[in-house]
UniProtKB/Swiss-Prot annotation:
Its EC number(s): 3.6.-.-
Family membership noted in the UniProt record: Belongs to the Nudix hydrolase family.
Superkingdom classification of source: Bacteria
Signal peptide, first to last residue: none
Organism field: Salmonella typhimurium (strain LT2 / SGSC1412 / ATCC 700720)
Record-annotated Nudix hydrolase domain positions: 36-164
PROSITE patterns: NUDIX
Name of the protein in question: Uncharacterized Nudix hydrolase YfcD
Length: 184
């Protein structure tokens, strides 16, 4: 009976190959222990005026406890769609619900801690925020420059996600400015 309860509470994740194709499923615990390649969502929460919502991870997190995160998000569960995962994570971690999410594509990140295919999203929110106590200890607003100045305090994967979001946003803004206006 105890074993059944343990299995029922196990979080299962898709394991993917270098092409982001599902090749297996494993427990989250096994994925972390063996540094298996998986999927995660990264959500840049911003105020629409240049500030990014930054989270401090709790000391009990299984991945980089106590560090700052430039994005909300987390591991995609087995068989879960990416946007569904992003919405779930934003609501669980911060209480963000009912706001539009912009999709910014996929990226790959690998370091000594993880191997992950990231799905990048963003949303505008001004709070109030309801923090998930076992994952997020506090939040604050920082500019990208302030984040860069404190980069050693941040999870490396969230910094990559933020940098990609900034680059992709700059390209979108440039394309909009170059687009000739229609005349009647």
């Amino acid at each position: 009976m105890v074993e059944q309860r343990r299995l029922a509470s196990t979080e299962w994740v898709d394991i993917v190959n270098e092409d982001n194709e599902v090749i297996a499923q494993s427990s989250r615990e096994q994925m972390r222990a063996q540094r298996l390649r998986h999927r995660a969502t990264y959500i840049v929460v911003h105020d629409g005026m240049g500030k990014i919502l930054v989270q401090r991870r709790t000391e009990t997190k299984d991945f980089l406890p106590g560090m700052l995160d430039a994005t909300a998000g987390g591991v995609v569960q087995a068989d879960e769609q990416l946007l569904e995962s992003a919405r779930r994570e934003a609501e669980e971690e911060l209480g963000i619900a009912g706001v539009p999410f912009a999709e910014h594509g996929l990226f790959y990140f690998e370091d000594q801690h993880c191997r992950v295919w990231g799905a990048l999203f963003s949303c505008v929110s001004h709070g109030p925020f309801a923090l998930q106590e076992d994952e997020v200890s506090e939040v604050c607003w920082l500019t990208p420059e302030e984040i860069t100045a404190r980069c050693d305090e941040f999870t490396p994967d969230s910094l990559k996600a933020l940098a990609l979001w900034m680059t992709r946003n700059a390209k979108n803004e440039a394309a909009l400015q170059e687009k000739p206006e229609e005349t009647e």
